[in-house]
């Protein structure tokens, strides 16, 4: 496995931008270095689609903009996109045989905005099929391997994104988070990742899984890098019905606030300029009970102790419905998935069976051949809970529970704490294939991330140590904020990363 030499030489996004501005390196050189590194690290299976001609054309355009003084804030920065975002030029498959060879006629808003800012895409990254999974083992194109230990999963569903960033193949990557799919792979691969408040980043052009839960978010080595990306990615999009418009910043009755795209930067500046003395960190007792591995607990506790040294105080809080987030999520998300994936029928686009009798057989065979086991499992669950006679008993009850989970968070933020911290995943990365006999065991790995997703809150993962038998599998600290508190979360993560070096560590080369 080979890291991009130029990328690691210059460091994060700000350092890369400075090097590009000073002509110490060109965008073409960075892009070619990244392409070479991606090829050398092909054993990780992080990339699904690479087109050097497209990448180098973007790099040449970035160099021209830099020379003309018209460059955007990310001009020449090498990134890559999760294969859940449609892209013009690169194929988009969502990790599924159903979309094998699909060519989108347009870019997703996230892709479009990053391109307008000058970022150079190295290609499309592997992911769990239709973003359904916690280990990136559900991709139709094979599992992604964790750069820290290639026997291990990278987390999912944005496993290719986390692996590419951890291996320093790219400066940053996009991901999607429905129930933890940015935070969990970020934690297991030792990088930083953030799920913004639901509605702050456009979902237009993001292949839908659970529409009331899906949210795009970036992954990068540091929180400062995340801020650079989030500043470009956020903002109202009239093409997305769930996109939030800017307003005066007053909270409504649910505690939500609608703000413009500059809110993260403003919150970051405000929080970053204040001492941490007196900051109340809520520590949910439910996050530190049975099921949490001792090595993960120790790393997270050490991170909390570091925040205490910076002046913050720990405050015990309770999120009593934490475990109930699992059944609530696995009713709501499959229900929405069964509706969203109904469009893949072999008629309009997607895989079509080669042999069939009538139209009904064509549709059923196309879906049976095109979808993998995990996707079929969730479609069946979703169809069942939405069926006549079960809708009230399951789906409506899950939605009521969702509201109660959100209220638990709001009570904690209103009366007890400023932010909430705890683990991202109950264990370090498992080995590939460990849960092959019980695929639903992966669902339990999301116990600390699902509640945040159901509530629509922002949360992030930052690397905070290592665990596992050989001590080389990363652990992530989850930082959860109130609605539209992305700036504060990023500022707190930055304060932590100023006094620790976990985010600067990269995996050593190893055979994949």
UniProtKB/Swiss-Prot annotation:
Entry keywords, A to Z: ATP-binding, Ligase, Nucleotide-binding, Protein biosynthesis
GO cellular component terms attached to this protein's record: glutamyl-tRNA(Gln) amidotransferase complex
Its EC number(s): 6.3.5.7
Catalytic activity: L-glutamyl-tRNA(Gln) + L-glutamine + ATP + H2O = L-glutaminyl-tRNA(Gln) + L-glutamate + ADP + phosphate + H(+)
A GO molecular-function annotation: glutaminyl-tRNA synthase (glutamine-hydrolyzing) activity
Keyword Ribosomal protein: no
PROSITE patterns: AMIDASES
Domain of life (superkingdom): Bacteria
Keyword Metal-binding part of the UniProt annotation: no
GO term, biological process aspect, one: translation
Active-site feature positions: 82, 157, 181
SUPFAM superfamilies: Amidase signature (AS) enzymes
Function: Allows the formation of correctly charged Gln-tRNA(Gln) through the transamidation of misacylated Glu-tRNA(Gln) in organisms which lack glutaminyl-tRNA synthetase. The reaction takes place in the presence of glutamine and ATP through an activated gamma-phospho-Glu-tRNA(Gln).
PANTHER family listed in its UniProt record: GLUTAMYL-TRNA(GLN) AMIDOTRANSFERASE SUBUNIT A, TRANSAMIDASE
Self-association state and partner proteins as the record states: Heterotrimer of A, B and C subunits.
Family affiliation: Belongs to the amidase family. GatA subfamily.
Protein name: Glutamyl-tRNA(Gln) amidotransferase subunit A
Gene behind the chain: gatA
């Amino acid at each position: 496995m080979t890291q991009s030499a130029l990328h690691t030489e210059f460091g994060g996004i700000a350092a890369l931008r400075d090097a590009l501005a000073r002509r110490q390196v060109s965008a073409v050189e960075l892009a070619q270095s990244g392409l070479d590194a991606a090829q050398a690290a092909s054993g990780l299976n992080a990339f699904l689609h690479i087109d050097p001609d497209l990448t180098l054309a973007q790099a040449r355009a970035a160099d021209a903009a830099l020379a003309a003084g018209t460059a955007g804030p990310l001009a020449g920065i090498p990134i890559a996109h999760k294969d859940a975002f449609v892209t013009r030029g690169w194929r988009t498959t969502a990790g599924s045989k159903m979309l094998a060879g699909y060519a989108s006629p347009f870019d997703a808003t996230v892709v479009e905005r990053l391109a307008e800012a000058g970022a150079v895409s190295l290609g499309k990254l592997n992911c769990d099929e239709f973003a359904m999974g916690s280990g990136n083992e559900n991709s139709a194109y094979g599992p992604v391997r964790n750069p820290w230990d290639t026997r291990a999963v990278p987390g999912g569903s944005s496993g290719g994104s986390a692996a590419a960033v951890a291996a320093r193949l790219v400066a940053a990557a996009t991901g999607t988070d429905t129930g933890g799919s940015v935070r969990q792979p970020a934690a297991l691969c030792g990088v930083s990742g953030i799920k913004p408040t639901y509605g702050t980043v456009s979902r237009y052009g993001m292949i839908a899984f659970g529409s009331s839960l899906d949210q795009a978010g970036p992954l990068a080595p540091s929180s400062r890098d995340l801020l650079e990306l989030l500043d470009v990615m956020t903002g109202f999009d009239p093409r997305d019905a769930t996109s939030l418009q800017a307003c005066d910043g007053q909270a409504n009755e649910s505690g939500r606030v609608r703000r413009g795209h500059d809110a993260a930067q403003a919150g970051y500046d405000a929080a970053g300029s204040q001492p941490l003395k007196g900051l109340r960190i809520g520590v949910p007792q439910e996050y530190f009970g049975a099921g949490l591995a001792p090595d993960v607990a120790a790393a997270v506790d050490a991170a909390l102790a570091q925040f205490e040294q910076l002046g913050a105080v720990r405050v015990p809080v309770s999120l009593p419905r934490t475990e109930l987030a699992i059944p609530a999520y696995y009713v709501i998300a499959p229900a929405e998935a069964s509706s969203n994936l109904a469009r893949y029928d072999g008629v309009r686009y997607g895989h079509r069976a080669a042999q069939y009798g009538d139209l009904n057989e064509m549709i059923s065979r196309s879906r049976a051949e095109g979808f993998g086991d995990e996707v079929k499992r969730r479609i069946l669950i979703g169809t069942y809970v939405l069926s006549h006679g079960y809708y009230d008993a399951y789906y409506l009850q899950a939605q009521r529970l969702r509201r109660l989970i959100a209220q638990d968070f709001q009570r904690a933020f209103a009366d007890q704490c400023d932010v909430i911290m705890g683990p991202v995943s109950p264990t370090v990365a498992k080995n590939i294939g460990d849960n092959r006999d019980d695929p639903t065991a992966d669902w339990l790995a999301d116990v600390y991330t699902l509640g945040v997703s159901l509530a629509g809150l922002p949360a992030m993962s930052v690397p905070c140590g290592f665990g596992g038998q050989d001590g080389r599998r990363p652990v992530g600290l989850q930082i959860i904020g109130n609605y539209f508190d992305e700036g504060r979360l990023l500022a707190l993560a930055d304060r932590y990363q100023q006094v620790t070096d976990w985010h600067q560590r990269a995996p050593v080369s190893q055979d994949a």
